[in-house]
């Protein structure tokens, strides 16, 4: 039986009037909303243990305060966080990310500290007298407008911030030949059956063949040849192209992009072949640099399993293991039975569990060569539209218990360089739909962990669309050198 988490590590005196306390805290959360928005427009992103507060309602902010109990043993109160946010709002800071949750917990655990002096010292290197931005924001182009292309569009628009560091300038796609092509593309971006309504406004500009997305004019360019796209006509220079088509995966094919004089580099949203670097942000992104002309962000499954494997190998040393991915269907499968060149995939995706192969084991060996020959993998496609599950069964060198494995992942999720990559769940009722639009590469399910001496099985959920797209954007920001510094530093 898995030991349940005790949420009452840090005790507080109970309030006499629960409703009165709630209304007080709700009012403070409501006051936070405009402050968070104002800071965002200045390039400052406010977080609560890694979760962004931007575009959150007052109730969502209160839920994020409650979430902190999963990390620290008790929730935070808006009474504790509001003064910190208010002080930050009065400071003149360079663009950065500030986790007010981590700041407040540090203050609560070190009551001798003067809060104003601590915050001032913590953010000292970010103080400025005037803004320092590049003369021109870096241009980004998305090549392809399918599932990943549209989700990337949503993320890039939402992360634009002050708009001084980078901008999504264009989307390149094949011309459907339909008179209302642009209107239909806007409709697909505006409403998504899995991820819901777009959080903002989308206007169609037929004259310029562009969409105005939350104030960002994004040109739609029709082409089927990367070398011949006339980016110059749209004043696009030294662009980074994100190729989400999957049509070209080797150096010869992807180099078509960089042969275009307006393109500086290309980032592939699929596993790259040959000598192309496959990068999983948080694990081997140190091998990616602004000098690379072609990079690949590997696959959604690779991004989900590699951080978990590295963490276990670093702490317990993997002898061997097997990975079974329970993967939501994709548009590569057939809605009803029909011909498909791959075995079994011709059968209806909506009606069957489909056993299929996966390149996950080979991908692991590319990124973690120390595990070459130690890992096998297979996949089962299931009739759900989104969110997948990696079941990782491993033999490790020494005996290890469930609590030790869980604590290893908990620390990684909240206080390591993997905190942007790994999420941690304590829920005893978690199911796949709970993780729609989850921002992390994987969510470690602590309640499902099994250990039998040196045999360990862990379960990792992952949004194979949104979580993966977030990883792509993290890698993009790294190679563009526009990642925001995060405070307080670990």
Predicted regions and their residues:
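C-terminal substrate-binding/catalytic lobe of Rossmann-fold NAD(P)-dependent dehydrogenases
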Residues: 2-62, 315-453
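N-terminal Rossmann-like NAD(P) cofactor-binding subdomain of oxidoreductases
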Residues: 2-334, 342, 474-475, 482, ...
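A generic transmembrane alpha-helix motif of multi-pass inner-membrane proteins
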Residues: 452-453, 464-466, 476
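A generic structural signal for alpha-helix starts
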Residues: 303, 399-400, 466-467
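Glycine-rich phosphate/pyrophosphate-binding beta-alpha loops
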Residues: 381-385, 461-468
């Amino acid at each position: 039986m898995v030991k349940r988490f005790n949420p009452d590590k840090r005790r507080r005196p109970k309030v006499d009037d629960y409703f009165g306390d709630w209304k007080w805290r709700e009012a403070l959360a409501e006051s936070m909303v405009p402050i968070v928005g104002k800071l965002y427009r200045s390039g400052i992103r406010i977080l609560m243990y890694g979760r962004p507060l931007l575009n959150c309602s007052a109730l969502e902010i209160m839920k994020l305060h409650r979430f902190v109990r999963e990390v620290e043993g008790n929730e935070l109160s808006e009474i504790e966080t509001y003064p910190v946010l208010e002080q930050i709002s009065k400071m003149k800071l360079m663009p950065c990310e500030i986790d007010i949750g981590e700041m407040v917990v540090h203050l609560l655990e070190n009551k001798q500290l003067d809060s104003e002096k601590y915050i001032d010292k913590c953010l000292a290197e970010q103080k400025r007298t005037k803004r320092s931005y590049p003369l021109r924001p870096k241009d980004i182009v998305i090549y392809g407008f399918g599932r990943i292309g549209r989700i990337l569009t949503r993320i890039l628009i939402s992360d634009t911030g002050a708009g001084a560091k980078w901008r999504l300038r264009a989307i390149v796609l094949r011309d459907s030949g339909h008179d209302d092509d642009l209107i239909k593309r806007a409709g697909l971006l505006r409403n998504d059956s899995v991820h819901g309504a777009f959080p903002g406004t989308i206007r169609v500009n037929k004259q310029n063949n562009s969409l105005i997305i939350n104030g960002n004019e994004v040109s739609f360019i029709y082409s089927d040849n990367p070398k011949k796209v006339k980016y110059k006509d749209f004043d696009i220079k030294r662009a980074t192209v994100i190729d989400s088509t999957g049509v070209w995966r080797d150096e010869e094919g992807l180099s078509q992009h960089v042969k275009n004089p307006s393109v500086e580099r290309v980032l592939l949203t699929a596993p790259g072949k040959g000598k192309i670097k496959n990068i999983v942000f948080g694990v081997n992104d140190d091998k990616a640099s602004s000098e690379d002309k072609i990079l690949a962000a590997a696959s959604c499954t690779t991004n989900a399993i590699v951080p978990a494997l590295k963490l276990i190998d670093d702490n317990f040393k993997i002898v061997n293991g097997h990975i079974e991915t329970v993967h939501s269907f994709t548009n590569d499968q057939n809605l009803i039975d029909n011909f498909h060149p791959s075995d079994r995939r011709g059968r209806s995706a909506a009606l069957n569990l489909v056993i299929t192969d996966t390149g996950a084991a080979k991908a692991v060996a590319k990124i973690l060569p120390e595990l070459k020959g130690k890992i096998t993998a297979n996949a089962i496609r299931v009739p759900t539209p989104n969110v997948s599950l990696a079941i990782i069964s491993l033999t490790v060198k020494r005996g290890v218990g469930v609590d030790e494995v869980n604590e290893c992942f908990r620390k990684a999720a909240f206080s390591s360089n993997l905190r942007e990559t790994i999420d941690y769940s304590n829920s005893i009722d978690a199911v796949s739909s709970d993780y729609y639009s989850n921002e992390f590469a994987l969510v470690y399910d602590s309640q499902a962990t099994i250990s039998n001496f040196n045999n360990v099985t862990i379960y990792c959920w992952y949004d194979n669309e949104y979580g993966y797209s977030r990883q792509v954007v993290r890698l993009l920001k790294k190679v563009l050198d526009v990642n925001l510094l995060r405070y307080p530093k670990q």
